[in-house]
C-alpha cells in the first residue's frame, strides 16, 4: 500500500486526494497522518538527489521555470518550480535539479547557478534561457564563458 501512496503522491495528488482514492478503490480508511508519514519517507531521498555531485562540464544547460497557482491559507498564490536540465559531453540528459520559489527572477537563478557550481559544475558551453531580464548577468557571474541562447518555447 505504501508504494501506491507514494506513486499517487509523486503524481501530484494531495494528502486528502490520496486518502479519498484509497477509500474509493480499496475500501480502506487511512488517516491524513498515515499518508503524511508515508510520503515523508521520500524527503531524505529527494534531498540526497538534490545535493548529489554533478559532472564538471555540460555542453548545454536548459534553465526554465514552470509557473502555477496554489491555494495557501485560503488565498490563491503564484508559485514557480525552477528546473535545470544538463546535456553532458556524451549527449546524455540529466535533470540537475528542481527548486521551488515564489516567482521566476534572475536573483533566484543566481542562487541556483551557484548551487550547481558548488555541486561540481565547473563550466557549461551553452545556457538556454527564456531571456528573463538579468538572466545573462546571473549566468555570466557564475559561468563567465558560457554562450547564452534564447529559446522561443518553454520547457
Model-derived features: where do they sit?
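Short, amphipathic alpha-helical "recognition" segments used to contact nucleic acids or chromatin
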Residues: 1-12
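Short alpha-helical basic/polar micro-motif
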Residues: 3, 16, 125
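Conserved hydrophobic/aromatic pocket- or pore-lining residues that grip, position, or stack substrates
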Residues: 5, 18, 35, 64
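DNA-recognition alpha helix
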Residues: 16-27
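RNase H-like nuclease fold core
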Residues: 25-28, 37-129, 133, 137-145
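Inter-helix linker motif
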Residues: 143-155
Amino acid at each position: 500500500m505504501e508504494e501506491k501512496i507514494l506513486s499517487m503522491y509523486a503524481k501530484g495528488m494531495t494528502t486528502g486526494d490520496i486518502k479519498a482514492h484509497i477509500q474509493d478503490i480499496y475500501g480502506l480508511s487511512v488517516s491524513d497522518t498515515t499518508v503524511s508519514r508515508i510520503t515523508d519517507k521520500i524527503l531524505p531521498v529527494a534531498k540526497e538527489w538534490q545535493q548529489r555531485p554533478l559532472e564538471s562540464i555540460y555542453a548545454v544547460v536548459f534553465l526554465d521555470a514552470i509557473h502555477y497557482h496554489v491555494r495557501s491559507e485560503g488565498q490563491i498564490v503564484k508559485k514557480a518550480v525552477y528546473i535545470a536540465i544538463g546535456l553532458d559531453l556524451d549527449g546524455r540528459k540529466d535533470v540537475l535539479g528542481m527548486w521551488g520559489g515564489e516567482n521566476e527572477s534572475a536573483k533566484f537563478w543566481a542562487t541556483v547557478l551557484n548551487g550547481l557550481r558548488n555541486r561540481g559544475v565547473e563550466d557549461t558551453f551553452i545556457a538556454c534561457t527564456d531571456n528573463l531580464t538579468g538572466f545573462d548577468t546571473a549566468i555570466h557571474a557564475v559561468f563567465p564563458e558560457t554562450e547564452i541562447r534564447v529559446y522561443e518555447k518553454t520547457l
